[in-house]
Amino acid sequence: MSKLQKILAGIIAVCVVFFGFVVVRIVAAPNDTSVKLAKIPQDKQLGKEAYKDAYPLEYNSFMKNNDTSPSPTGYGGAQEGNSHLTEQPEMVENFKGYKFAIQYDDDRGHTYAGVDFKNTKRLPGQKGNCITCKSSYMYDVYYKQSGWDYASKPIEEAMGPIEDDQWFGCSTCHDPETMELRVYQQGFIDSMARRGIDVNNASHNDKRAYVCAQCHNEYYFMKEDGRVNHPFDNGLDAESEYQFYQSGQAGGFTQDWIHADSKAPMLKAQHPDFETWATSVHADAGVTCVDCHMPYMRENGQKYTSHWMTNPLKTTEESCLKCHDESAETLKARVQTIGDNTFK
């Protein structure tokens, strides 16, 4: 081997080792972040501001939920004042006699959970169970003290002590002492247990779904005490849940409302996101809510989980292209077609 060949071989060997190291660093990076666990004062744990300095990347990305830009496809999104009743006027007739015929707006980001709830025209006459998922105050204070008693309180009384900073925040999904994901919505825990699933003994990957699923699901309020329950017993597809209601398994609950014109008992699917996911190809592949809606990001060499809970088409590189080999344009076109076929 000539001297030049030896030099070239040496350069190639160094490059192989260097790039191999880079690839290993990227691929083998742990799923959790390397952020050190911070001690949050107990009297500040239900708020958000106390976590700001300890977890700046997560906090700053969470505040991006204030974004009200439209969806990349033009359907849905978080724009203030966008009404389903305007976009789909047939809903006014479909929901006649029900409060959703009065106001039914597009969801805004989680940072608006408190203000949008307090300002909805559907609020009068509701009970405390309506804010079970809006703040961890409901669990960490009310439920720990007196179980489901809060569920039957007038809504004004139940939400009165909740400070502005204590609506949906870090402790809604994380144990404030350990920052581990926590599944604590008792109605969800009980409903999954009836299916033989102990959600708090689940794998970390499953918890990345359950932490969202405990609130993003179909639910109803038990007639006896107002507690939250879920129609999961017979299965998670729409037909199984409908059969649950029809068979009298719902503990005295029979309908969401009586239609004003037809007088027929009616059911309204709330937001069965968990069930839609659980019966999907993504769930079969082990892909969770977090993988698509809160993907891993990197900033200044730090890997972290984005807490901007948003449309995956706004983070296509991180959310979709880690698995899909199609282009971003192809994936968007596919979603666009589904939206067009649904709403046009």
Regions found by a protein language model. Give the residues of each.
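Primarily the internal scaffold of c-type cytochrome electron-transfer domains
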Residues: R25-K99, Y143-Q166, T172, E177-D291, ...
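N-terminal Sec-pathway targeting helices
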Residues: M1-V16
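Long, charge-dense tracts
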Residues: G81, M91-I131, I162
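Hydrophobic alpha-helical membrane-insertion segments, chiefly the h-region
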Residues: A13-I26
